[in-house]
């Protein structure tokens, strides 16, 4: 098996090995991965953190050995907990990992901190929405929740439908706490959106941009549009 590490600020992951293919996710600095397929110009990779797969360009690949790969897994890590940080002549995005303490990083923990979860969520307010994005240059709804949870010490999968399998269901918004996660469904009852509750009537989520909106038992109400944009399915507590 072959291994790699993201040595750039961010690397796009695409659905197919083509420049015009859909962006499905992104690698952040020091993310490690395995190679599962390749052609002349592209590598299909699987991320170590969330097992998400996509194609990256070979020109952006940095090879590492099996021993180095295992070493990165076991090594103590710090995580950028500011919207962005200048490190080693690179602009690193929120959620990127490094191997030394800086003023913009905290130790990557394994125990969930609810306060850190909501504080992290607010740090990314007004970051633009981008389908498949995972950085401050553009982020989608599930990557936003995944990264905030990562900084707060909880490992969530990449997609909203997968995230919905985690946690304990909360019966209603009146029973919800800040830091609970709200999931939203389409007409086919499929989970298509996710956000973080700030209170029983406020939610922060990525839709157009990372924004704060009203929420009630029906769903998210956008005051600018004067209407509901997402239909509430259920609430989970990590």
Where in the sequence are the language-model features?
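Aromatic- and glycine-rich peptidoglycan recognition patches
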Residues: 10-11, 63, 170, 198-238
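Short, basic/aromatic beta-hairpin or loop at an interaction surface
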Residues: 1-14, 68-82, 147-163
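Short aromatic-glycine-enriched beta-strand elements
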Residues: 40-44
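Boundary regions of SH3-family modules and the immediately adjacent low-complexity/disordered segments
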Residues: 1-2, 25, 47-127
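...with weaker cross-activation on analogous glycine-rich loops/strands in unrelated enzymes
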Residues: 154-218
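Structural motif
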Residues: 31, 96, 179-180
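Active-site nucleophilic cysteine motif
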Residues: 121, 136-152, 157
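SH3/SH3-like (including bacterial SH3b) beta-barrel domains
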Residues: 16-29, 86-92, 172
């Amino acid at each position: 098996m072959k291994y790699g590490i993201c040595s750039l600020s961010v690397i796009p992951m695409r659905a197919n090995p083509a420049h015009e293919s859909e962006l499905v996710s992104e690698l952040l600095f020091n993310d490690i991965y395995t190679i599962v397929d390749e052609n002349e110009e592209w590598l299909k990779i699987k991320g170590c953190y969330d097992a998400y797969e996509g194609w990256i360009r070979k020109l952006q690949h940095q090879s590492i050995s099996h021993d180095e790969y295992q070493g990165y897994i076991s090594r103590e890590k710090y995580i950028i907990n500011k919207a962005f940080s200048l490190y080693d002549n690179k602009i690193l995005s929120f959620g990127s990992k490094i191997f030394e303490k800086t003023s913009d990083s905290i130790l990557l923990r394994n125990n969930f901190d609810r306060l850190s979860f909501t504080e992290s969520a607010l740090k990314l307010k007004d970051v633009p929405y981008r389908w498949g994005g995972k950085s401050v240059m553009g982020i989608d709804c599930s990557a936003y929740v995944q990264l905030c949870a990562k900084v707060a010490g909880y490992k969530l999968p990449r997609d909203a439908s997968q995230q919905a399998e985690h946690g304990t269901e909360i019966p209603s918004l009146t029973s919800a706490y800040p830091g609970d996660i709200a999931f939203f469904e389409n007409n086919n009852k499929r989970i298509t959106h996710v956000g973080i509750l700030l209170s029983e009537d406020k939610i922060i989520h990525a839709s157009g941009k990372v924004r704060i909106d009203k929420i009630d038992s029906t769903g998210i109400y956008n005051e600018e549009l004067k209407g509901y944009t997402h239909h509430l399915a259920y609430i989970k507590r990590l």
